[in-house]
Amino acid sequence: MGVDLESVSEATSGAIGSLLSTTILYPLDTCKSKFQAEVRARGQQKYRYLSDVMWEAISKGQVFSLYQGLGTKNFQSFISQFIYFYSYSYFKRVHSERTGSKSIGTKANLLIAAAAGACTSVLIQPLDTASSRMQTSEFGESKGLWKTLTEGSWADAFDGLGISLLLTSNPAIQYTVFDQLKQHLLKQKNAKAENGSSPVVLSAFMAFVLGAVSKSVATVLTYPAIRCKVMIQAADESKENETKKPRRRTRKTIPGVVYAIWRKEGMLGFFKGLQAQILKTVLSSALLLMIKEKITATTWILILAIRRTLFLTNTKGKLRSP
């Protein structure tokens, strides 16, 4: 069975786009994660606002610590996007071959996206857990990837996997909201258009706006799960009188973090850091798609050039052999 070059091209360009967008937005992501991970009663918070995380790093002279765990996060982003885009492209091709049609309906597309997301979540969960722990560690105290993962059992490396699988529904919610808004808007515009005129289509700007709105709605609806996941994966708080003897990591559960949020912060606590999450998610998605579109053609040309070079090399080798 030959290599699916189109899937490889899509996966590579998506992975590179994810790597660049992750690096650009990483300080914001670190501040967001540390802000989300803290759960304390009113008046005892270390971070009252998202900006407090940034000021803490500046006051401690640990500005570069806003990038702690960047290597692991980039590795995770590259691998996860490669797996996702390859899986998505592969499942899409298999569906087209079985149905005999290149067009894919909305429901089938959502199922394919969910399947690709589930495969990605299972395979990269240890990296996701490690990067979250490294980000939420005290500034200047972040550990390496291997040491972070070996603090607990291998089961601990898959902390939050259930929520990660649940969050694969996020794209389904986004596309459903986008489709409903699009149909409503086009219906209004077509009603105002004169009879006999060509059908109205969405402009690029309106498509971007509807995409941002639908992504924001999906983020709001799934945000309590997002915050619980960050808290489960977050590093344990360091104590000032803590000895240098290594401590076994405290295991966190979904019921445990839900109860902690409810008891200390109330209902609104489930939405703490929502604004930062929406800002980061929308910017990240926009950057990822923009960069991916710009480099897809170049990636495809490079892959074809490499394939052609390997083919010529193999051909020459066969001709020279007796």
Swiss-Prot record:
Gene name as annotated: PNC1
Solcar repeat start-end pairs: 5-94, 104-184, 202-298
Protein family membership: Belongs to the mitochondrial carrier (TC 2.A.29) family.
InterPro entries given in the database record: Mitochondrial_sb/sol_carrier, Mt_carrier_dom_sf, Peroxisomal_Ade_carrier
Tissue: Expressed in stamens, pollen grains, seeds, leaves, cotyledons, roots, stems, flowers, hypocotyls and siliques.
Subcellular location(s) per record: Peroxisome membrane
Entry keyword set: Antiport, Membrane, Peroxisome, Repeat, Transmembrane, Transmembrane helix, Transport
Main location: membrane
Highest taxon of the lineage: Eukaryota
Transmembrane segments: 8-28, 104-124, 158-178, 201-221, 254-274, 286-306
One Gene Ontology term of the molecular function aspect: antiporter activity
Record-given protein name: Peroxisomal adenine nucleotide carrier 1
Organism name: Arabidopsis thaliana (Mouse-ear cress)
